[in-house]
């Protein structure tokens, strides 16, 4: 079976053609999702091209209406939040590390350039053009960042773009190449905050979307999630953001709004110098990325690269220290639907993937995780096998574990026999008792963190495992997360963000589960 998508790019029109008859079983299973995401990507690109230009789209009276169709995940309105941008490219992670690490000593040149930048931006200018000219002079002469004001093929005109030229294979003759420009940094600026009719952050978001939706970049969009940095400023204030293009646009601020005004404090200039050095490093990182992409074998095919929709972390070391490569196959989130926009939820749920040798895995991004507690339960078959842990940046870990076949969360599970809930709760009790004997508190003991699966010994019998060891801590020492959801989730009295974790609260949560799933069972599992 074949299906064809007509596409166009800088060179003559070509087609993306899939021969689904030659796919493996695993590839054939993913093919419907691949088709939907391919269509969603180009549908969004068409919508962006048909939308007003950035200066009109970002207007307060225009953006709310257009946002209903575009669904940019730029935190405005607050319901439109995507997964963290640092999941998707090393350049963003490097920027955050460099810009926030106070142990990094900026160079004397960067420090002096930051003083010049503050002196220039603290002045009062008669209009936006005058301020932008002063800003670009300092960025060019002092920091080596060149910006050009160009009109895009869809008639948009951002305030400034730091471009990089790469070589790409001709889609009709792969032995030949052509030159294309990609956006490394997109800048949008306003003369002052007061009186501005649009937010430079929103306008930069719109300019990014317009640049990467150009029809001539269709081939690049098929291979890359198009990472770029955004420089947003209003008067003597600026911030740096990151942006990617999945099946919609995701934008995250990577700094706070930083004042560009002279002070008597050295630390202020040090901070600005550190941020600007990090921006230059990100510029070089992204330029290197696009150079490598243009020369890669994947650019020689007409197929869309499905990995463009997922994070760039695709390797880990297993328990024996062996490097393992993997790829992503799906989202483990019901709300992450490619038709309704892949990431239109505040999702921190894991991904599903497959290693190079065919093992199905779960890939979880998290800020904290108790690997020791997970391994403790896994040894007794009370948690999925932990395959690897990778710290990709400060405060961000990637947890890789086995994918549990034929499993459902307890919340989703529909038993064929009533006593199957009893088997489930017996295993939950065993897991919590094991953790408690070793001084741990599980913390987030809810039906969504319990997987139910068939027992291999008996087809009608089921068993349960715990997942999500993010909260697990030591009894009386560690605390419940201050970010815990106390609005839509009812917790037993005593469980509060920032308060010490205690075993007795796990017992309370166990009792609640018992009442919900086995109220008919007279001899309570949890009575001492």
Regions found by a protein language model. Give the residues of each.
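Charged, often low-complexity linker/regulatory segments
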Residues: 5, 14-138, 263, 270-277, ...
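A short, conserved, highly charged catalytic patch centered on acidic carboxylates
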Residues: 90-222
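Nucleic-acid nuclease catalytic cores
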Residues: 197-201, 209-253, 394, 523-526
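Juxta-kinase regulatory segment immediately upstream of eukaryotic protein kinase catalytic domains
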Residues: 269-337
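ATP-binding glycine-rich loop module of kinase domains
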Residues: 322-384
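Conserved structural core of kinase catalytic domains
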Residues: 375-426
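Catalytic-loop of the protein kinase fold
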Residues: 436-455
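C-lobe/activation-segment region of protein kinase-like
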Residues: 458-528
């Amino acid at each position: 079976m074949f299906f064809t998508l007509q596409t166009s790019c800088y060179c003559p029109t070509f087609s993306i053609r899939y021969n689904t008859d030659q796919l493996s079983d695993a590839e054939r299973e993913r093919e419907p999702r691949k088709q939907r995401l391919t269509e969603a990507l180009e549908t969004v690109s068409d919508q962006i091209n048909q939308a007003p230009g950035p200066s009109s789209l970002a207007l307060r009276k225009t953006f709310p209406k257009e946002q209903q169709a575009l669904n940019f995940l730029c935190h405005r309105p607050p319901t439109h939040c995507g997964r963290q941008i640092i999941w998707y490219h090393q350049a963003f992670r490097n920027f955050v590390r460099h810009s926030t690490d106070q142990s990094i000593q900026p160079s004397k040149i960067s420090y002096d350039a930051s003083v010049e930048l503050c002196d220039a931006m603290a002045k009062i200018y008669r209009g936006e053009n005058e301020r932008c000219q002063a800003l670009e002079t300092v960025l060019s002469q002092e920091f080596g960042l060149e910006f050009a004001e160009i009109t895009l093929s869809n008639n948009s005109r951002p305030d400034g773009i730091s471009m990089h030229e790469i070589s790409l294979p001709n889609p009709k003759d792969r032995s030949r190449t052509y030159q294309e420009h990609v956006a490394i940094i997109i800048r949008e600026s306003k003369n002052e905050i007061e009186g501005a009719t649009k937010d430079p952050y929103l306008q930069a978001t719109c300019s990014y979307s317009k640049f990467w939706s150009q029809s001539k970049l269709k081939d690049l969009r098929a291979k890359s999630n198009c990472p770029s940095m955004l420089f947003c400023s209003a008067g003597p204030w600026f911030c740096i953001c990151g942006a990617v293009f999945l099946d919609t646009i995701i934008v995250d601020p990577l700094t706070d709004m930083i004042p560009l005004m002279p002070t008597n404090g050295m630390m202020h200039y040090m901070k600005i110098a550190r941020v600007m050095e990090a921006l230059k490093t990100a510029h070089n990182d992204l330029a290197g990325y696009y150079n490598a992409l243009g020369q890669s074998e994947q650019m020689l095919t007409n197929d869309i690269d499905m990995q463009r929709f997922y994070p760039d972390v695709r390797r880990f070391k297993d328990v024996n220290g062996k490097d393992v490569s993997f790829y992503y196959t799906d989202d483990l989130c019901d709300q992450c639907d490619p038709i309704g926009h892949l990431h239109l939820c505040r999702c921190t749920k894991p991904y599903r993937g497959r290693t190079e040798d065919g093992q199905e895995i779960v890939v979880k991004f998290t800020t904290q995780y108790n690997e020791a507690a997970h391994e403790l339960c896994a040894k007794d078959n009370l948690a999925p096998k932990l395959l690897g842990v990778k710290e990709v940046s400060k405060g961000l870990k990637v947890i890789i574990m086995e994918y549990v076949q034929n499993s459902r969360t307890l919340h989703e599970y529909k038993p064929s026999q009533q006593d199957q809930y009893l088997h489930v709760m017996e295993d939950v009790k065993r897991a919590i008792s094991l953790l408690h004997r070793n001084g741990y508190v599980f913390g987030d003991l809810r039906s969504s963190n319990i997987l139910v699966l068939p027992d291999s010994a008996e087809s009608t019998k089921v068993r349960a495992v715990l997942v999500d060891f993010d909260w697990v801590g030591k009894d009386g020492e560690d605390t419940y997360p201050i970010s815990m959801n106390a609005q839509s989730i009812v917790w037993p009295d005593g469980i509060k963000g920032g308060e010490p974790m205690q075993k007795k609260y796990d017992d309370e949560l166990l009792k609640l589960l018992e009442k919900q799933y086995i109220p008919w069972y007279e001899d309570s599992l949890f009575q001492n």
